[in-house]
Design a protein with these regions (language model features):
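Electropositive polyanion-binding surfaces
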Residues: 2-6, 10-16, 25-27, 35-37, ...
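Compositionally biased alpha-helical segments
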Residues: 50-61
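Major-groove recognition helix of helix-turn-helix-like DNA-binding domains
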Residues: 108-113, 126-130
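A short, conserved structural fragment
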Residues: 115-127, 227
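Accessory beta->alpha helical hairpin/"wing" motif in late/C-terminal subdomains of nucleic-acid enzymes
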Residues: 124-140, 236
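Short, amphipathic alpha-helical interaction segments positioned at domain boundaries
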Residues: 136-161
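Low-complexity, highly charged intrinsically disordered N-terminal segments
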Residues: 168-272
Length: 679
């Protein structure tokens, strides 16, 4: 290569012109640029040779001359000619086409235009081939989309900055949703998020100079006002729908405006009965009521009236399919997510005080010992007389209110019934139960005591379930029977060594097998019943609604809407959704339990050692007795089951499900209760 040859090579990602000075060795040359700076290059690094006869002083003028010729629009005109001719070109040929000569300045300008072009030409060796018309059209379309995306990206960043500066001031656009949803999924699923979502979310976080972590994504969504500080990630990870589709809401409205014909035209009129509904004060879906009467022959009859949503819902309609998809009403500390639209669930479906309501009523006569002597099941009309809370009923029973003898009679039969089930092998487990509520960001925890009112309602619901199952079994009716295998409990002598109360109940609870839903009736061990089906919550539990569909059709003399095979198929999908709902409820309650403890980090709590989780690691389950919360705790000293402790929160992080408790006062080993420990 001659000294004085002007060449192009790339330096730090940019074109660079230099004049060849001398060889350095057999493989390298020394070239000098316009700043008289020397560079050592390999000939393979040369991307274009302009020609000999140049000095470094001439480079700036040469570059200025080239700059005047760099018109990208002229390349399109040349492409139109060449694509029609089907001819490839090199820089010299393109210079001739564009500038009508092959002067070094124009040839180099043509080289720059061709090598920088990504639209009209593609390089093949030393020549450039024109792309086809369709290829150019596709590339232009892609470029337009890329430009649009870049503009949307820049606009999104601008809106994000505005929202961070002034929360609530931004109207998000449809084009923002993909990035914001990716951010939500990254914060929700964390390391398990889709890689594409993670990448998009991390790009947003990086652009806002925030850590590229799921926790930072969560904090950003809160700062933007899109999420609450205590956003329910368990609910977001689930498939549980929060909003009702428009078609379902439309059907609910139409059923309210124009009620369908009642399939049970011969409903029994029970409006003469005094009906008590007994629930928590916050209950909105009122699905059961109780009555008591004395028959002409002197026998006493209990009535358990269950709300009849099948008056408003038919198998396979929009309301039914949506309820099936949800499977249950979800009860969370922050509120409920209903199975049916609220306007119909808390309206005509519910047993509202003073209104004539449709019900499925179970009339039961018990033997003096508490066994079912006779029963009847009828579609009915009732008029609930009183809406009472559990506290109201407990007070009435305590005071012996003479004006309401029905309440005392129902409570008496509830106790008889409980004793009868105990004689049949029922297994009672009375563990403290916490009710966690969040109202206006205030977290409260209330212990639900096993009061007489709660016991009598529970016994009546269990009674209705036994009667429904008996009816299904007697008529060979496909129903979702609920069964529970007999547990293998520790020997009584071993249980008696444990402190009575929560410790002993915890040991029994640990041995209890899960209840199962089956089309075949079988014993329910913990209830002490030979057959049982849940039917008392059809507004909020889809399996109960299924039982109503089946029983009511049979009462009318019709073929049940679901065959055994169809019922089994529906139950499989419903059971999976119900299990997910239970998981969300459990995890959400735990989160708010930990949040309550975080807010009361300096408070002292009375703890009780329930059982060992891993005794060799000194890891036990403790019960915070005032709160009904069960938490794992690791000890650094010997402890005994049933030992009472004074505890304080050492560290708690609700979002990451971490809590560490510590003892405030540590007794000596000699002070430990002498209790046989049952792992």
């Amino acid at each position: 290569m001659q000294k004085g040859t002007l060449i192009e090579f790339w330096l730090h990602g940019h074109r660079h012109l230099a004049v060849v000075d001398r060889p350095k060795d057999n493989k390298h040359w020394i070239v000098v640029d316009h700043l008289n700076q020397a560079h050592t290059i390999n000939p393979r690094q040369i991307t274009y040779t302009i020609g000999p006869g140049y000095t470094t002083a001439e480079i700036p003028a040469f570059q200025a001359a080239v700059a005047t010729q760099l018109d990208p629009d002229s390349l399109e005109v040349a492409w139109e000619i060449l694509v029609e001719e089907g001819r490839s070109v090199d820089p010299a040929a393109m210079s001739t086409l564009l500038f009508a000569d092959t002067e070094p300045v124009n040839c180099y300008a043509a080289h720059c235009l061709l090598s920088e072009d990504k639209l009209y030409f593609k390089q093949k060796g030393d020549v450039y081939e024109p792309r086809s018309v369709s290829q150019v059209a596709d590339l232009k379309h892609q470029a337009t989309i890329a430009q649009q995306r870049q503009q949307e990206w820049e606009t999104l960043l601008s809106r994000l900055q505005q929202a961070l500066a002034q929360p609530g001031s931004v109207d998000w656009q449809a084009s923002d949703r993909p990035r914001l949803e990716a951010l939500e999924r990254y914060a929700t699923f964390k390391e398990e998020a889709n890689p594409r979502d993670a990448t998009q979310a991390q790009e947003v976080l990086a652009a806002l100079q925030r850590p590229e972590t799921p926790e930072a994504a969560f904090d950003l969504l809160v700062a933007l006002g899109l999420w609450q500080p205590h956003e329910n990630l368990f609910l977001r990870r689930s498939q549980i729908p929060v909003q009702f589709p428009p078609t379902v809401l439309a059907m609910a409205t139409s059923r309210l405006d124009a009620p369908p014909a009642d399939a049970d035209r011969d409903r029994v009129d029970l409006t003469h009965l005094k009906v008590y509904t007994i629930d928590d004060i916050s209950t909105l879906e009122i699905d059961d009521g109780l009555s008591w009467e004395v028959l002409p022959d002197g026998r006493e009859q209990l009535w358990i009236h269950i709300a009849d949503p099948t008056r408003w819902v038919s198998p396979g309609d929009e309301l039914d399919l949506e309820a099936r998809r949800r499977s249950t009403t979800l009860y969370l500390p922050t509120g409920m997510i209903p199975m049916f639209p609220p306007e119909i669930a808390t309206g005509p479906m519910s047993l509202n005080q003073g209104q004539v309501c449709c019900a499925l009523s179970f009339g039961v006569i018990l033997t003096p010992a508490g066994a079912v002597d006779a029963y009847t099941i009828v579609p009915s009309r009732i008029r609930p007389t009183y809406r009472l809370t559990y506290e109201d009923v407990d007070e009435m029973l305590e005071l012996g209110v003479q004006a309401e003898p029905e309440i005392a009679a129902i409570a008496r039969w509830g106790m008889v019934r409980s004793q009868w089930r105990q004689s049949q092998g029922a297994i009672a487990i009375h563990m403290p139960e916490a009710s966690i509520k969040v109202q206006d960001d205030e977290v409260t925890i209330q212990l639900l005591d096993n009061s007489l009112a709660r016991q009598l309602v529970a016994e009546m619901m269990i009674l209705a379930g036994e009667v429904a199952a008996r009816y299904g079994q007697a008529h060979n009716l496909p129903l979702p029977f609920r069964n529970q295998p007999q547990p293998e409990l520790p020997p009584e002598t071993e249980l008696l060594q444990l402190p009575p109360g929560p410790v002993r109940y915890s040991a029994i609870r640990r041995c209890m097998p899960r209840s199962e839903v089956s089309l075949s009736p079988a014993r329910h061990a913990s209830l002490g019943l030979d057959t049982y089906a849940q039917v008392t919550s059809p507004i909020r539990r889809y399996s109960d609604l299924l039982a109503h569909f089946q029983i009511k059709a049979h009462l009318r003399g019709e073929t049940p809407p679901f065959s055994a095979e169809q019922l089994q198929e529906v139950l499989m999908s419903v059971s999976a959704a119900a299990q997910e709902a239970v998981w969300v409820e459990r995890q959400t309650n735990r989160y708010w339990g930990l949040e309550f403890l975080r807010r009361h980090a300096t408070d002292l709590w009375q703890g009780l050692v329930l059982r060992w989780l891993r005794e060799h690691e000194s890891l036990a389950l403790v019960l915070l007795e005032e709160l009904g919360l069960e938490l794992a705790m690791r000890f650094d000293r010997p402890v005994a089951l049933g030992e009472q402790l004074t505890l304080r929160v050492a560290y708690v992080d609700p979002r990451n499900d971490v809590i560490h408790l510590r003892e405030v006062d540590t007794p000596t080993v000699t002070d430990l209760p002498k209790v046989e420990q049952l792992a």
